[in-house]
Amino acid sequence: MIPPQKVFLVDDEPALLRALSRLLRAEGFEVAPFSNATDFLKAHDPDAPGCLVLDVSMPSMTGIELQQHLIEAGSNLAIIFLTGNGDIPMSVRAIKAGAVDFLTKPVKDSELIGAIRLGIKKTHENRSTQNEIASLKNRLKLLTTREQEVFLHVVKGEPNKQIASTLGTNF
């Protein structure tokens, strides 16, 4: 059985948090609502997979500031902005920084759920890619010094004879 996918909601509007929580739970998501970015950061495990649905305009820390904080912390959490007062430069900045989507309130349920599913898919793809990279780095560490020298020439695309000549061995 596949565990429920976690969606973090951060919005300072209590009525919206309740409505979105009900909607997403009905769709089978596990929901963690927060009324501000500070509470979210206190409770959030940076290694936890999932998707963050985030308001732009909030007191103390804006959604854009939270996004930047998560990027600096190395989080892979997919971010979807949901705002009532965004503008084009703000949305471009958010998307360039890695947001999956930038939606405006009111939003169709199907549009939000589709964006969340895409965000969760991207989170899993990023996690899989990071695991693959870590595995490859560990395998590289197993190479001897000489094998590492040869490897560096191979990845540059040098032919075997040139590598042998450069490293002073016979081919």
Predicted features by range, described:
Residues 2-5, 13-32:
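Two-component/phosphorelay signaling modules centered on CheY-like receiver
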Residues 8, 47-53:
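Active-site beta3 strand of CheY-like receiver
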Residues 35-36, 61-68, 86:
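Acidic catalytic/metal-coordinating carboxylates
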Residues 42, 64-76, 93:
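Short amphipathic alpha-helix used as the core "switch/output" element in two-component signaling
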Residues 58:
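Receiver (REC) domain active-site loop signature in two-component systems and cognate sites
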Residues 87-89, 103, 107-116, 162:
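C-terminal output helix
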